[in-house]
Amino acid sequence: MPNHGRLTQKGSGGASEADRSQVLLDLRGVEKAYRTPAGDFLALKGIDLQVQRGAFVAITGKSGAGKSTLINMVTGIDRPTAGEVHVGNVAVHHLREDQVAVWRGGNVGVIFQFFQLLPMLTCAQNVMLPMDFASLYKSTRERRERALYLLEQVDIAEQANKLPSAVSGGQRQRVAIARALANDPMFLAADEPTGNLDSKTADAIFAVFAKLVSQGKTILMVTHDRDLASRTDRCLRIVDGQLVPARINKPLAQEIV
C-alpha cells in the first residue's frame, strides 16, 4: 500500500499480514427503520458489506433506495436499528452519542453535495475548522500550514484566502475535500459529491478522488452518475434497501494522470 504520509504528513504505521486487517468497513446485517404515520419504513434491509483499506467503492441507486442512509450508518451520523457497524477495530454501533462525535471528528471525512462551507470563513479557515474542533495541531500556525498543504494537494491553494462565495462550485468542492482530509481520517464518505457540478468539473473532482486513493485513502462514494461509478474499483447498487452484488470495475490506476 502506498505511504499515506505523501498525502497526510502523518505516518501510516505497519499493517498486519492477516487478510482481516485489510477490511476497514464491515457492516453485518444492518437494518434501519424509520417511524412514519403509516408504520415503520425499513430503509435498509440486512446490509452486509465489507470494504478493504485503500478501496474506492461507489454506491448507486434510485432516490430513496437507501444510499444516504447507508452513508449515515458508516459515518455514525445515524444508528442502525439492528446489525453491526465496524470501522477498523471500532464497533461504531456501540458508541454513545458523545463518543461517536469524538470518533467521527478524528476518523471520518464527510463530503456533501452542497459543500457545507461556512460562508464567513475563508477557504483556509474552513479547512482549519475540524482541526480546531478535534483539538489537533497545537497552534493556529500549525493548523494553517496543514490547511495550505491540503489545499495544495487538491490544487486550490491559490484561493486559500478567499471566501467560498468568491470561488466556483468546483473549487468549493475541492475546499470541502481538503476540509474532509484535515484530521487524516481513516476513510472518506462522499454523498453525491459531484451532483451539483457540471460534467467537466465532476471529472476533475473524480480525478482528485483517484489521486487520493492512489495515496492510500479509502473512499465510499454515493452517486447518481453511472459513468463515474463505473470508473471506481467496485460498484454496488442499492435497490429497496438491499445491496445488489458488487461489480469489479477496471483498474483505478487508469484514471490517474
Question: Where are the regions a protein language model picked out?
Answer:
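ABC-family P-loop ATPase nucleotide-binding domain
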Residues: 1-33, 245-257
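ABC family nucleotide-binding domain
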Residues: 23-238
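H-loop (His-switch) and adjacent beta-strand-loop-beta switch element
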Residues: 235-248
